[in-house]
C-alpha cells in the first residue's frame, strides 16, 4: 500500500472521479441495460481496466485492480459502501460525514478508512438508494426511510436538518436469522430462561419485549416467534419488514410512507385494525411506537392471545409507562386507571434485553405482570441478570439469577398443556 499512501487521498479520489466520467462516456448504456447483471459487469470491468491501465499514476497492479473495482461499484452499486454490504460481520453502517464512515461489528463501533469524495458524492449514493424504492430526498423532504434489496433498513437525513452534510444509517440483517441456540452460545440468556420463554409463547401468553436502540429486540422477537406452532395463522406488522419467521401460515404486512405528493401513507394502526379482520391466531407487531398500542391491547384482550410486540424502553416499568403514553396518543379520553387496567389485563410478561458496554447482549429480566396494586401496574421478576464487575479488558461480568418466584401464569400454562418444572423457579445463579 506504500504507493497508495504516498498518493494523496484527494488525488486518488480525483483520478477515480475523472475515470468514472470517461468510462461512462465510452459505455453503450442502452446495450448494457439489456444485458444480464453478470455479463454487464464483466463487460464494464474490461472497459474500466483498460482505462485505468492507460492512466499515468503511481499505483501498483493490485492498487489498479482496487481502483477498477471501486469504479465498478460506483456504476453498479453503492460506491464505497459496497465492501461493507458484502461483509456479513457488519451489523450497522453509520455515515456521519462523507469522510467519517463507522461500522458496528460484534457490538462495537469502529471508524473505517472508507470515504466518499465529498458531500455531493455521498448525496448521489443516497439518492440512488431512495430512488430504487420510489422515494425522494431533497430540501423539501430532507428525511427518508428506505430498504435495500437484502432487507437492510436505511435512514438518510440531509441539510438543512443535518448541519455538517448528509448522514446515512444502514441497519443490516443477516441472511439467516439468529437462532435460539446461538443466543445460548452468546450467553444472551440461559437454558432455563429459554425453557420458560418457549413455554410462554406456546402457552399463548402476550409478551412485550423491551429494550433500547440496538439492544436486540427484533432478534429476540424473531426467536420467540419461532416457538409459535406451525398450525397458527400469524399476521406480522412492521414499519420495515425484518422478521424472518419460518411458519407456513403467515401474512406479512408493512406500513407505507406518503408518496411525493404527501399522500397514500398507511400507518401501523391501520394495519393492526385491518389484521383483526384477517382471522389471525397471533398478531406480531415489530415495534409499537404510537397510537396503535391501543388497538394492540384491544386485540390481546379480545381473543388474540399469544401476541407479541416490542417497545423502546430501558426497564419493564418504563415499558409499561411507554405503552400507557402511547395509548393516550389515540385521543380516546380514557381515564389513566382504566388504561392501566387494560395494560395489566392484556400483557402477561415483559422481557427486557440490553446491549452492555462491552457490546454483548443480555436478557436482563423476565418479569410477570401480576395485575394492579393501588392504581399502579404490579410486576415481579422471575429471572434477572446481575452485573458484578467489568474486567481489565472491558468485559462485563455477571450472573443470571432465578429469583425463586413462581409466576402466577404457571397454572394457566399447565392448564394449556405446558407444565413447567418446579425446579425451574428455584432460587439459583448461573454464570
Set out the residue ranges of the language-model regions:
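Conserved phosphate/pyrophosphate-binding and hydrolysis machinery centered on Walker-type P-loop NTPases
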Residues: 9-13, 33-42, 57-68, 83-91, ...
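Walker A (P-loop) phosphate-binding loop of P-loop NTPases
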Residues: 214
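N-terminal anchoring/assembly modules that precede and organize ATP-driven motor systems
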Residues: 1-110
